[in-house]
Amino acid sequence: MLGRCFPPNTKEKQQLRMIKLCDPAESELSPFLITLTLAVLLAEYLTGIIANGFITAIHAAEWVQNKSVSTSGRILVFLSVSRIALQSLMMLEITISSTSLSFYSEDAVYYAFKISFIFLNFCSLWFAAWLSFFYFVKIANFSYPLFLKLRWRISGLIPWLLWLSVFISFSHSMFCINICTGYCDNSFPIHSSNSTEKTYFSEISVVSLAFFFNLGIVIPLIMFILAAILLILSLKRHTLHMGSNATGSKDPSMEAHIGAIKATSYFLILYIFNAVALFIYLSNMFDINSLWNTLCQIIMAAYPASHSILLIKDNPGLRRAWKQLQHRLHLYPKQWTL
């Protein structure tokens, strides 16, 4: 959808685009697989919207009640709002592209979807990276003076870093409009599943694309990986120290540390899979209708939903609020039957 390559700007561009979208020769998926893929994607979108909507509602209620919100809660609000917008956008794009192809193929509509998609994805990547970094600074057990100073100042820095991430993501999304379009020239070939047609990037576009992806995807990816690995190592070292001093009975603190290690490991795996899928999808490495491209879409849709569910499961406040919500939902049918 958002990773297509188009020919240069001409009067026939919209017609050529629709031909490329509708050409059955490029489709590698059967009607059954297409229907199954759409069903899976819609289920992932709805799950992500519900989970992130719950996180947003809980912290918004905390903000209204206490006139303030914790630093981690602020990051979660930014992250969940960006994911709600992203999941809604992707679901809307599937609906429009499936029901009104002529409208979707218009330049203004297509580029609005593309820019919004990249902006929200980059925001999500940055916010998740800052969440990992914040947990690392607050939980990791290091005694370096610079680290201790950072721990003391991190709560005041996070709001500025979040808005800086929004600005960076917006700048990249506006910049991408000139570099994420393929050109049929004779400079740099990109793999296409159709052997009768070759798609090319101009040399300038290739350099710009590499710079663009490095800043938008690789930097938050590296930051997330480093923060998560250092946090896991710190928790592992502390767990081993606690184990050596254990008396034999189960220590709740040790179990909490082990749970934190597992949760951080899951977050790290999900984040890496999502970043790689996004990079492949935006790079046009595969045809838009190929199985690999579809797999990337499924991964990108699954990440916000699965990560948010894990956040609810591993956060005591969110987990308690979710159980209370489930309890109230179970009570409503009983009240109606009385």
Curated annotation (Swiss-Prot):
Keyword presence, Transmembrane helix: yes
Molecular function terms, GO-annotated: bitter taste receptor activity; G protein-coupled receptor activity
Keyword tRNA processing: no
Membrane-spanning parts: 31-51, 75-95, 117-137, 157-177, 206-226, 263-283, 292-312
Protein keywords: G-protein coupled receptor, Glycoprotein, Membrane, Receptor, Sensory transduction, Taste, Transducer, Transmembrane, Transmembrane helix
Major localization class: membrane
Topological domains annotated Cytoplasmic: 52-74, 138-156, 227-262, 313-338
Chain positions carrying an annotated carbohydrate: N194
Cellular component annotations (GO), alphabetically ordered: membrane; plasma membrane
Membrane topology qualifier: Multi-pass membrane protein
Extracellular side: 1-30, 96-116, 178-205, 284-291
InterPro entries membership: TAS2R
Record GO biological process: detection of chemical stimulus involved in sensory perception of bitter taste
Subcellular location: Membrane
Family (UniProt): Belongs to the G-protein coupled receptor T2R family.
Record function comment: Receptor that may play a role in the perception of bitterness and is gustducin-linked. May play a role in sensing the chemical composition of the gastrointestinal content. The activity of this receptor may stimulate alpha gustducin, mediate PLC-beta-2 activation and lead to the gating of TRPM5.
Note, other: Most taste cells may be activated by a limited number of bitter compounds; individual taste cells can discriminate among bitter stimuli.
Protein name as catalogued: Taste receptor type 2 member 39
